[in-house]
């Protein structure tokens, strides 16, 4: 009989990412869905040596290994309810990307726009398309290698039975003018991907989400999302 393994390892936080999302609500369900979303990865003091990112600028995309810091639990369940199945059907946790896992680790592929060297914090990675909350700890960064990482013929499991939900987004121009120009495209993309929980479909309900220092309120009726108010937090 094999002896049960007692091996464990300690992961060091090498960086944190800063994004437009101070809470989980509204974050795209996968990386790359909203490429216009901009984020900055700032290394912790121990890992700010520019030599550590030498050559990374030659890659267009990178992998991020990170912690579901907003969903850490002491226990785990072998099955979870994926939102894309309406929140009622259970699947094995390892057949999903649920944050409620034995080890709460996430994996995201993002576009590397550029690397800046800033005197106060060293190298900063400017990325696009991240699906991470502001302040999320990063444990590792690896280059995305197309010939090895891209699998066009891969089967999609239960996700092949569901469709990406896109909404028409409507707003009053006076409200939209309250959104900084640099954030408009990202916010529009987030809203178009329907940030509501998958089980909520009340057309009279007013939803609110925080985005880039703004409080954005909206309703959804059928395939149309209407922005009802935007205020500065």
Predicted ranges, named:
Residues 110-113:
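Conserved positions in beta-strands of structured domains
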Residues 1-105, 117-126, 130-233:
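Mixed-charge, low-complexity intrinsically disordered regions
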């Amino acid at each position: 009989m094999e002896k049960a393994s007692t091996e464990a390892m300690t992961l060091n936080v090498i960086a944190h990412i800063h994004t437009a999302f101070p809470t989980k609500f509204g974050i795209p369900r996968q990386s790359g869905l909203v490429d216009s979303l901009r984020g900055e990865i700032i290394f912790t003091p121990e890992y700010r040596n520019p030599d550590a990112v030498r050559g990374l600028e030659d890659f267009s995309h990178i992998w991020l290994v990170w912690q579901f810091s907003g969903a850490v639990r002491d226990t785990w369940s072998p099955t979870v309810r994926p939102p894309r199945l309406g929140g009622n059907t259970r699947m094995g946790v390892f057949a999903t990307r649920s944050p409620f896992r034995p080890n709460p680790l996430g994996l995201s592929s993002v576009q590397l726009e550029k690397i800046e060297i800033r005197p106060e914090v060293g190298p900063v990675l400017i990325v696009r398309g991240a699906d991470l909350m502001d302040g999320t700890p990063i444990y590792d960064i690896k280059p995305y290698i197309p010939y090895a990482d891209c699998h066009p013929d891969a089967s999609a499991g239960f996700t092949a039975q569901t469709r990406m939900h896109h909404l028409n987004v409507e707003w009053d121009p006076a409200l939209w003018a309250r959104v900084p120009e640099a954030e408009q495209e990202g916010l529009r993309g987030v809203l178009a991907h329907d940030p509501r929980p998958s089980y909520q479909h009340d057309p009279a309900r007013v939803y609110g989400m925080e985005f880039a220092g703004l409080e954005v309120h909206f309703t959804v009726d059928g395939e149309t999302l209407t922005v009802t108010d935007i205020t500065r937090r």
